[in-house]
């Protein structure tokens, strides 16, 4: 797993290595493809009563994770009070196929709250990506209950355990 924490290292220092280091860390292209291909993220916030974990749809634009959340939700209240978040996107059932990406940082609200669809150039790309990923089209439909959150990760950790088990050649 690679620990890419810009907030805790000098600009000229390479990312610190965790267990197994580069052996199972996804490269940027693999990570981007993985995030684009998965559908559900697990979003962890902190409420006054403790951790709060919820599934949420998202899109990744290559630099930021975009989340659309109901503005009357516990998650929204948590993030309004404390914008720190951890997001996990993972896949795999068996140990040898586990892979995932954890993104940590602070979210920021982007656009109107709640979103009704007023033109907003900074939301053009995430809404196009979201409509294509979840609605099979180019147009995002707004229900007046959701709004956008953008997470530009301060730390990204990725792993792909399939790298530990290279495909064995079969002989006939």
Regions found by a protein language model. Name each.
Residues 48, 90-94, 135-136:
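Short beta-turn/strand-loop junction motif enriched in small, turn-promoting residues
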Residues 2-26, 98-172:
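Charged, gly/pro-rich active-site loop segments
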Residues 32-33, 57, 77, 93, ...:
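Short secondary-structure boundary/capping segments
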Residues 73-75, 94, 165-166:
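Short, surface-exposed beta-strand-loop junctions and turns on beta-sheet-rich folds
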Residues 17-42:
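Short, basic/aromatic recognition patches
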Residues 29, 74, 79-82:
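Short amphipathic alpha-helical segments
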Residues 38-71, 79, 87-89, 99-101:
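Short beta-strand segments
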């Amino acid at each position: 797993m690679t620990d890419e924490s810009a907030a805790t290292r000098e600009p000229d220092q390479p990312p610190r290595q965790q267990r197994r280091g580069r052996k199972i860390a996804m490269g940027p292209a693999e990570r981007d493809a993985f995030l684009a291909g998965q559908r559900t993220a697990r979003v962890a916030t902190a409420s006054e009563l403790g951790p709060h974990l919820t599934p949420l749809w998202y899109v990744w634009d290559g630099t930021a994770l975009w989340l659309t959340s109901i503005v009357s939700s516990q998650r929204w209240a948590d993030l309004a009070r404390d914008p720190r978040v951890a997001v996990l996107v993972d896949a795999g059932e068996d140990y040898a196929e586990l892979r995932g990406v954890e993104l940590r940082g602070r979210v920021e609200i982007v656009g109107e709250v709640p979103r009704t669809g007023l033109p907003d150039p900074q939301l053009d790309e995430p809404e196009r990506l979201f409509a294509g990923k979840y609605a099979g089209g180019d147009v995002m439909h707004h229900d007046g209950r959701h709004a956008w959150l953008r997470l530009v990760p301060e730390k990204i950790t990725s792993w792909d355990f399939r790298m530990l088990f290279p495909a064995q050649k079969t002989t006939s």
